[in-house]
Amino acid sequence: MVPLCGKWGEAVRVLRDKRLRRYMLAAGVFISFNWGAFIYCVASNRVLDASLAYYINPILAILVGFIVFRERLTTAQWAAVALAAAGVAAPMVMEGEFPLLAVLIGLSFAIYGAIKKKADVPGDVSTFIETLLVSPVALGIILVMELRGGPISTGVIGGWRLILLPLAGVVTYLPLFLYSAGIRTTSMSLSGILMYINPT
């Protein structure tokens, strides 16, 4: 989007700003962990953890909004949060173990949202820069996984899969861009509640 919209100047301005550059790098690290952990869950048959993470995330996003941004909720909203927390706790109790990976996935996205809100950089520019900063590491990980093989091998080096990998980036860019644009003017608590619209 940045090259297409001619926003190189804005991107360069953000990259030159030490504080904003740190925010963008941190955002890139947290979203990379979030997606990497989600993919690991799916690839290793831990689908419950992957699904549970997206029920935990809204609660954590609301708490981050309350603690970091001093957002206030009404009594009815706190009651809704408590009901959601009870709904999330039920499968944890039934499973008999603490879903650490699910909590980390949910927490990483809540922190990602807080970073994007604090940075207050236009959505297209921030998504472009965070992707740019973590791309070398991501490409290195893909290469290592391919060379080693195993259950989390992506199978993308060579053939038509090599074409699909960049296209997957295009498809996943749009939701991140929209989220990045929206979180600048939306409270963390409202964004957390809206996360329950997500398919899990």
Please identify what each model-predicted range represents:
Residues 8-37, 100-104, 152-174, 195:
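Loop-to-transmembrane-helix transition segments
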Residues 1-3, 97-150:
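Transmembrane alpha-helical segments that form core, pore/gating elements
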Residues 1-16, 84-97, 135-160:
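Membrane-interface helix-cap regions at the ends of transmembrane helices
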Residues 76-92, 103-107:
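Hydrophobic transmembrane alpha-helices of multi-pass small-molecule transport proteins
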